[in-house]
Amino acid sequence: HLFGALGSIKNLIDKIAAAKGVKTDDGRLIFDWIKTGDLISCELFDDYCDDVIWQLHNIQCILDPQRICIGGGVSENQIFIDGIKTAVKRFYQSLPIPFPQPEIVKCKYCNDANMVGAYLHYLRKNDER
């Protein structure tokens, strides 16, 4: 599977909605279920976070970052960030040998990062003229 499909929030939403027999694409509703401790939602969220950590670990093995920044709209949700951080701890504790654990942080601009980047690019391009 491609990471974009496996690690996407849409994938998480679809899995939880299907497991609960509900038709929705509302991520806020899904995270409300997780926040209130819904067993199905929490179990699938934990599985999702574990899948994401495998992908982040692969990136770590290739690029060796000390810090991994999580962005996008979902990064504004503390439940998501906490879930990823918990999965990181669980993953690295399960390894048979010590392995450096990257710091997981939320990106500063979250979902607005692309707009900030586009604006800075615009300013630089127009400053060159």
Predicted regions span which residues?
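ATP-binding/phosphotransfer module of carbohydrate and carboxylate kinases, centering on a glycine-rich
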Residues: 1-129
